[in-house]
Amino acid sequence: MIRSTTRTAMALAALALPAAALAHHGWAWTEDEESRLSGTIESISFGNPHMHIKLKASKGVWEVDLSPPIVAERSGFGPGAAKAGDSVSLTGHRARDHDLLAFKAETVTVNGKTYDVYPQRPKDLRPEG
């Protein structure tokens, strides 16, 4: 009986993992409409599974997800392209839950250059800069 319960629990956990991964890695948590976000980079991470920026903007500090590093680096946005203290302008999608200061960026404009970190996604807004 214990062995059966353990197997059932493991099977349910295995089924739940892909759903959790899709919730984080997908776009369902974001608004459909594109928007802009500008501010100053507080920190930037070029690690897997997604690059990440903490961005100080007028309404607070935002958590910004970008593409996986390999995709961003193909656009030219890799280590050295941006650093803490740089001003940045983003286009992308904010969280559907407006209590969260969370944003998923499609383009990053920093130091006079625009990087399309999600080149496969259609875009309605043109980057500023």
Where are these regions (language model features)?
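Short boundary/loop segments of OB/S1/cold-shock single-stranded nucleic-acid-binding domains
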Residues: 21-35
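Conserved hydrophobic positions within beta-strands
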Residues: 39-41
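Short nucleic-acid-contacting surface segments enriched for D/E, G, S/T with interspersed K/R
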Residues: 74-90
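Bacterial N-terminal signal peptides that target proteins for export
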Residues: 1-10
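OB-fold/S1-family single-stranded nucleic acid-binding modules
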Residues: 95-119
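Extended, charge-rich, solvent-exposed interface segments
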Residues: 115-129
